[in-house]
């Protein structure tokens, strides 16, 4: 494959992964096991080890394979990176910025004791309820665009589609909002703030009214 494209894809994935690992590690330090996984491992007739394989590790491995298809294809594609590839880099950079800024804003918000029990209606969170999830989807869409410039990269579109679906409709947004829905002020926040794609408040409110 083209050396520039290979290095570009590697750099994009590495930068995204290192930032996310640092953020999750710092946020989770000293807080014990993720309660979602703990509940999953306790429920059902199968033992914890079997449930971990069937419902955590195996699905994550399959998801990783599909989501990384653009990277796999991009590593073997011939031909130089053209204008579409650099559009992909711009989309990736936009997504990474949304993730990083959104996470930083939320961390600062939670660090203030005065905000305990309130809704983070600040910064990027005024335009989307999940700027970090939107950013994650944009990151992998950008990586797909870099790979889609050459054959067979265009065939790897299931990667960003699956990632976006999981974040917007699957295990990401849906599970989080299920636990947040009863927090004071959160339902009002949902009515005036876009659920995924960043939108101005007036448009989000109008769409919510039209949806009934």
Where are these regions (language model features)?
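Hydrophobic transmembrane alpha-helices
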Residues: 1-20, 24, 52, 62-105, ...
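Active-site neighborhood of divalent metal-dependent phosphoester bond hydrolases
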Residues: 20-37
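Juxtamembrane helix-capping/reentrant segments at transmembrane boundaries
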Residues: 32-55, 118-125, 195
